[in-house]
Design a protein with these regions (language model features):
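Short, surface-exposed beta-strand/strand-loop-strand elements in extracellular ectodomains
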Residues: 1, 190-196
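Aromatic- and Gly/Pro-enriched, solvent-exposed loop/edge beta-strand patches characteristic
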Residues: 8, 12-32
C-alpha cells in the first residue's frame, strides 16, 4: 500500500547545501508478521537530465539518485527501536526506464515485477544497495505541502487523426498525471504527448 495520494514528495532545494526530509506515520500500514518497505526512486530535481533555461542539468549537486530512511518503532513496553537504510536493502531496475520532471517518463510494462514490495517476494538476482555519501550533512524538515491529487478529469472529446494518432481533450488546463487502460499486443509502444491550447 502506498502513502496516499502524493505524487511528488521531495521538493526543490540546493541539494549540496541542504536536504529536505519528510515524515510519515506508517502505523496503519503495518500488519502482523513480516512487513516490507518498498521504494521507487526517481531522478526528481536532484538528477535533472533535461535541458531548460534554468540549467538544472548542469547543477553542481547533480548525481545518481540517493535515498535514506529511518523507521522509528515504539513498542507497548515503552522501548524504541530504529531501523535505517543500509547495504542489506536490495535493489533492481524497475519498469520506469527513464524519468524527468520536464520531459517524460518511459515505462516498460514488460519489466513489471508483481509483488516486489510484498512479503515473501523472491528477490533472487537483485543487488545489495550501495552505501554512499550524502551531498550535505544539513537535513531540514520539509514544511511545504507535497504535490498531491486534488481532482480527476475525464476526456470530453476524442479526435482521430489517423490509425495511430488520437487527440483527447480535457475540460481543464492542469498539471497532472495521465491514467489510461489499453489492450494490445505485448511489446506495443504507446506514446503520450501533452499540450495546451
Amino acid at each position: 500500500r502506498g502513502l496516499g495520494d502524493v505524487y511528488k514528495r521531495q521538493m526543490y532545494t540546493h541539494f549540496d547545501k541542504r536536504i529536505l526530509s519528510v515524515t510519515h506515520d506508517v502505523t496503519s500500514l503495518l500488519s502482523l508478521g513480516e512487513n516490507v518497505i518498498g521504494v521507487q526512486l526517481g531522478n526528481g530535481w536532484y538528477n535533472h537530465q533535461s535541458t531548460a533555461v534554468w540549467f538544472f542539468d548542469k547543477a553542481s549537486w547533480r548525481n545518481r539518485p540517493k535515498f535514506t530512511a529511518q523507521l522509528h518503532l515504539r513498542y507497548t513496553d515503552g522501548t524504541t527501536e530504529y531501523l535505517g537504510t543500509d547495504s542489506t536493502w536490495q535493489t533492481t531496475d524497475s519498469p520506469v526506464i527513464f524519468n524527468s520532471i520536464y520531459t517524460a517518463e518511459h515505462y516498460d510494462a514488460q519489466k513489471e515485477l508483481a509483488g516486489w514490495d510484498s512479503p515473501g517476494f523472491n528477490a533472487t538476482g537483485w543487488y545489495h544497495a550501495q552505501e554512499t555519501e550524502s551531498p550535505t550533512e544539513t537535513i531540514k524538515s520539509q514544511v511545504m505541502h507535497p504535490i498531491r491529487e486534488t481532482a480527476r478529469y475525464t476526456a470530453t472529446q476524442c479526435k482521430k487523426i489517423n490509425d495511430s494518432c488520437y487527440v483527447y481533450h480535457f475540460p481543464q488546463n492542469i498539471a497532472g498525471v495521465t491514467e489510461l487502460k489499453v489492450k494490445g499486443k505485448k511489446g506495443t509502444k504507446l506514446r503520450l504527448k501533452h499540450g495546451e491550447l
